[in-house]
Amino acid sequence: DLIMEVIKNPGIRPAMFVPTHINRKNPKLLEQVFELAKCGGMVDATCRKDVNPDSENMSAADFAMLAKENDLLDHVTFSSDAGGSLPEWNGDHSRITGMGIGTPETLMFELRNLVQKKHLPLEEALLPLTSNPARIYGLEGRKGAIRKEADADILVLESDGLEIRDVISRGRLVVRRGEVIKKGYFE
């Protein structure tokens, strides 16, 4: 009951608390995060390519589908832990055998899972990656949607495999037909 205990604190509103790494197959945790979402809070699912069906984790796509079944998809965000450490486990998950690094590609991996395997319409599958995070971080109007006066951050996807074709960042084309044409400061 730790999640609900946090928001019982008079100084913490549900919208101020965003638990992450919540895509676990733990019924009690799922009950709590959905209760938080029903109170107006947001929850974040971690995207990974290597979720073993026998592990304690579920894919971010599976979590999003559970949220949709509970009419709570607009309370879910996805994150990648890009650049963060990801433990690599032995076969029975009893020992860490190495350390990997999270990559942003896992976000697109889970978007494809939602659209191609779970058959969620693209406009709904995009919510945890676009308008939902923009809303909780106070960026609505500038980020998360294509509209006049917004920053014009746009991914153009191939229709058949949802591969990234073009990237527009703040109105400037930075990737054309899959090739980087303008690099950022840290690339």
Predicted regions and their residues:
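Positions that flank functional sites
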Residues: 51, 130, 182
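C-terminal cap of metal-dependent C-N hydrolases
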Residues: 146-187
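Residue-level "edge-of-site" marker
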Residues: 49, 127-128, 162
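His/Asp/Glu-enriched, well-ordered alpha-helical/loop segment
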Residues: 68-148, 154-156
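C-terminal extensions
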Residues: 2-5, 119-123, 177
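Active-site core of metal-dependent hydrolases
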Residues: 1-89, 94-97
